[in-house]
Amino acid sequence: MKIIKRNGAEVPFDITKIITAVTKASDSVGGQSRLTREQITQIAAAVTDQCQALNRAVSVEEVQDLVENQLMDIQAHDVARHYITYRYVQSLKRQTNTTDERILSLIECQNEEVKQENANKNPTVNSVQRDYMAGEISKDLTARLLLDPEIVKAHQEGLIHFHDSDYFAQHMHNCDLVNLEDMLQNGTVISGTYIEKPHSFSTACNIATQIIAQVASNQYGGQSISLTHLAPFVDVSRKKIAAEVEAEMEGLDVTPERKKEIVERRLRNEINRGVQTIQYQVVTLMTTNGQAPFITVFMYLGEARNAQEKADLAIIIEETIRQRYQGVKNEAGVWITPAFPKLIYVLEEDNIRPGTPYYYLTELAAKCTAKRMVPDYISEKKMLELKVDKNGEGHCYTCMGCRSFLTPYVDPETGKPKYYGRFNQGVVTINLVDVALSSKGNFEKFWKIFDERLALCHRALQARHKRLLGTPSDAAPILWQYGALARLKKGEKIDKLLFGGYSTISLGYAGLYECVKYMTGKSHTDAGAKPFALSVMQHMNDKCTEWKKAENMDYSLYGTPLESTTYKFAKCLQKRFGIVPGITDKNYITNSYHVHVSEPIDAFTKLKFESEFQKLSPGGAISYVEVPNMQDNLEAVMSVLQFIYDNIMYAELNTKSDYCQCCGYDGEIKIVEDDGKLVWECPKCGNRDQNKLNVARRTCGYIGTQFWNQGRTQEIKDRVLHL
């Protein structure tokens, strides 16, 4: 069994430390109040048993809380008072320097919490450590100086989660849709250098990767670009190559058909190089956040403005999917699944059924998904039904990064819909499981506590908003001055972009399944519990509408991914309520509205059921189905895609994509338990060295490749197949 020290280091559990601490507290009191050696040993043994039952590494604070409870249970009030006083004095000493130990431990790679915080960051790398060091300072400033103490306390206790406090000290927003079209067509400035409109497709791709890196370094969330914005440059290259071929062939007896063949072949080679530039630049770039950019590439034929552009876009999409199917090589020279860019493919009337013009692209996408877990899928049909603007027109557009969706918006200056160049201000998540447990199953209390927690979330979201108010465009010129999000003047404040629906701000939620299970005794898939689940969702939407009307800001409900926070919430719930069977007996809680990962349900029933909840998550949500190796059953994959098109707006298929560098095994790397800790192990050779294992799993919309904390690892282990 392990224990996590205050600096984040993970060390073996030592019962003698409990005995020593309680003995010191006992020795500080006089006479009959002192405990016997036998009593102290019994207390230590009871605490050890409780820690063992949690089946995870516990923190020092959790152990001390359990010791206090044991002392109170045996009426040892004087000893408990001395023990608590000692804890308080030590905490005051630590407050004089709140970050030193954690920073030093992460530099020496001893901080287990940091090691497993982000599935796409390698904490042993210097650049990542610099980001984490800055993050520790930001979190400390946020907790001590920048946030209301009540919000800080609620965050620490797991009632809510104030996302990305490691960036809150700076005036940064969350995620966005990059207006790549504006930047490429009208020019931009990168690091003080003017970049004019590119004269070829390959140059456009190269500039796009530079923009991606710059944008990622000035925000903390994901970003999305559309391949449609690159499509016009295919014809630019075509004409350029055609002129070159004409010059080369002047005076030669070459037919126009032959010249056209040469042009198209050279053009295809350039498209290949351009797409390859994006793929390899994205996975090898290191932003100031200490990681590759969290970038999503959108593939939507319906965005093309004319037949030529659509045909060229189809070529780019085909090449993008082919290259992702191939993968990238690891250190051993083996083709593996990269985490980025995330790909989103739109299912539409032109590509969803046999005989349609672009059905071949959907077949290729299905083949790629079966091997590499991408692309994910948006149904144009369902999105046009759900994303309707004030003029009654439906729109299809990509999410910002993983799953955060903008609300429909009509630009008051042009009267036209606008999506690229918009962004999200930030997220605060409510822990629905805590609301339920705090109510003790009483529905009247539940709704009262629910409203209190939502009010707390509202205040926290207002803090997010106020942190951005007054930000000058100079804070991030690539975003606010040079087209990624706006073309503001130097020194101009971004305030007008924070109101009126231009940007969104998100109320996140997590643990709907556990919340409903505790209140009703049933899963929300049960007909008797589903109405309550839907009423919880509707209530949060109603609050967002209420806040929006009062403040002229687009609050929207967001299905929180909870990458590492799932573990934090689970530990907080166990600390506050103990082990409640079926509710807090796991080291994770369920993401957003999802069916519990261990609940038996088929893919089609799951997608149909969750579609009702996705509709009530307008600020963003994604559904998934867990599938086995489908590379030899693409017909089944196509049937799932057809079902997605007809039934749900946004969904993905999860499979496994692993490789052991020690023995060459390319099947599923297993999760095994060792001394109370879950570890990854090659079933063929027993290799457990994470540096020699390539494991790709869907974490929360993105694919993670740097392993996960114990809570998320248990969740991955518990997943059942839906096909």
Indicate where each model-derived feature is located.
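Contiguous, well-ordered alpha-helical segments that form the cores/surfaces of helical PPI scaffolds
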Residues: 299, 505-518, 538, 698
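Long insertion/accessory domains within large nucleic-acid-processing enzymes
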Residues: 686-723
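Conserved catalytic cores of very large enzyme subunits
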Residues: 89-501, 522, 526-688, 694
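Amphipathic, well-packed alpha-helical segments that form the structural scaffold of globular domains
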Residues: 23, 458, 462, 513-517
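Conformational switch/transducer regions in large eukaryotic molecular machines and scaffolds
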Residues: 14, 677, 699-702
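Metallocofactor- and cofactor-centric catalytic cores in central/energy metabolism, strongly enriched
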Residues: 271-275, 279, 517-518, 712-718
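Charged, amphipathic alpha-helical regulatory modules used
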Residues: 1-110, 717-722
